């Protein structure tokens, strides 16, 4: 019953497809009397939170980073910070968490539970560079230019000398992984979702 939120369709300009997908989702969610939605993807988080209400789909929307922060604060998750304490980790801000929803401190708070060696990229937070996948760009051919965005962003990572990139978006994960492969750095630098780092820190 679960289907795409319609975010890629709307970003690509196919409003009819977006509304069809959105209304189908709202019908299913309302049939289960859903009040709260926990999202993994920032694109889904943004569209459920900020755009579905215009179509009658009003829910409490929580991103999993917020959920993890609360679980850590309440002592529900016990993290062994020795596993990554000396590992140099940088964080890539997903556009739909950062720019669209001003969620900058929450992922960094999670990371501070994992490592003492966190390093910011020069372009971070409000100045962070997109990974290149947003706005449905992931589903189309690259436009003409001197360099693709995912390569530019990977070069930002390399300047930090980090051995782990952390992010919180499946689109960003794909683009950063591709960037590491393009630069032949996939053996030296690993790409993790924040939830994966937490899981490994808990020896799960």
Residue ranges of each PLM-predicted region?
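Iron-sulfur cluster-binding electron-transfer modules in prokaryotic oxidoreductases
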Residues: 1-204
């Amino acid at each position: 019953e679960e289907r795409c939120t319609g975010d890629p369709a709307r970003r690509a300009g196919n409003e009819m497809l977006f509304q069809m997908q959105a209304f189908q989702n709202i019908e299913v969610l309302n049939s289960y009397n859903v009040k709260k939605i926990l999202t993994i993807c920032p694109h889904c988080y943004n569209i459920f939170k900020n755009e579905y209400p215009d179509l009658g789909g009003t829910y409490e929307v929580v991103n999993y980073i917020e959920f993890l922060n609360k679980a850590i604060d309440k002592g529900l998750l016990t993290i062994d910070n020795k596993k990554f304490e000396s590992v140099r980790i940088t964080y890539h801000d997903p556009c739909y968490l950062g720019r669209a929803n001003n969620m900058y401190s929450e992922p960094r708070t999670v990371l501070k539970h994992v490592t003492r060696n966190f390093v910011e990229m020069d372009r971070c937070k409000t100045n962070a560079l997109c990974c290149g996948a947003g706005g449905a760009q992931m589903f189309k051919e690259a436009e003409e230019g001197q360099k693709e965005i995912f390569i530019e962003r990977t070069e930002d990572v390399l300047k930090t000398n980090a051995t782990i990139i952390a992010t919180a978006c499946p689109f960003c994960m794909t683009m950063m992984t591709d960037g590491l492969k393009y630069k032949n750095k996939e053996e030296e630098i690993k790409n993790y979702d924040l939830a994966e780092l937490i899981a490994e820190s808990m020896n799960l």
